């Protein structure tokens, strides 16, 4: 499993992502990657390690705690010129087993973590996104308790669910088992107000496979078979 996880982490270098949120089933693996012993060397091989976030992962002294959030500044011709780019803050949380705090799961209760950190992040960014490994019901509770949040991405729904608006917070769900590709588009007017459009596309046989991704997958499978 460790070799398989390494290959997945390396894929995030080939197809970069801005943020990696720790999910409930990822907590053990995340702590192995964040172990202080050899961290610099691992992060050089797998830079995605530096993009791991979690506001409620509890770690011991032998592990370097991930930041609770990251801020990415973006710019473009459709973003009103304010002398700087648009600062997007990503806060990562996950729902512990049983929905509350359980020391055996190395987690802190995610609702308390969000309430504590959302005001801090809100002061630093223009758009606040919570990436939450939880279901739609708890994502709605996060929105109710943290009305300063602009967008919540719920990444553990039981099935494909339509977007939901709670106050001014826009909630979208990631499709389970990578069955669909989500596309969330944000529109910023001249007054600095956001509106959203969400599309979800079936990843079926009608969607052509990327040749580079197919070649990478074949190489990964060959490597895993060699290690078995």
Please give the residue ranges for each predicted region:
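Acidic, metal/ion-coordinating pockets
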Residues: 1-228
């Amino acid at each position: 499993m460790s070799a398989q996880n390494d290959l997945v982490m390396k894929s995030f270098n080939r197809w970069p992502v801005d943020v990696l949120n720790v999910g409930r089933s990822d907590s053990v693996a995340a702590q192995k990657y964040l172990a202080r012993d050899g961290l610099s060397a691992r992060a050089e091989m797998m830079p995605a390690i530096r993009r791991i976030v979690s506001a409620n992962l509890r770690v011991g002294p032998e592990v370097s705690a991930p930041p609770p959030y990251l801020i990415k500044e973006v710019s473009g011709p459709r973003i009103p010129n304010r002398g700087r780019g648009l600062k997007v803050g990503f806060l990562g949380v996950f729902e512990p087993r049983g929905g509350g705090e359980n020391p055996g799961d190395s987690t802190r209760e995610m609702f308390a973590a969000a309430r504590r950190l959302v005001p801090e992040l809100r002061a630093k960014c223009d758009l606040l996104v919570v990436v939450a490994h939880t279901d739609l019901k708890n994502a709605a509770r996060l929105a109710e308790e943290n009305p300063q949040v602009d967008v919540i991405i719920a990444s553990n729904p039981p099935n494909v669910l339509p977007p939901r608006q709670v106050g001014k917070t826009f909630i979208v769900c990631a499709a389970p088992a990578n069955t669909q590709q989500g596309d969330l588009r944000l529109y910023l007017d001249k007054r600095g107000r956001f509106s959203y459009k969400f599309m979800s596309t079936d990843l079926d046989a009608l969607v052509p496979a990327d040749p580079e991704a197919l070649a990478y997958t074949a190489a990964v499978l060959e490597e895993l078979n060699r290690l078995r």
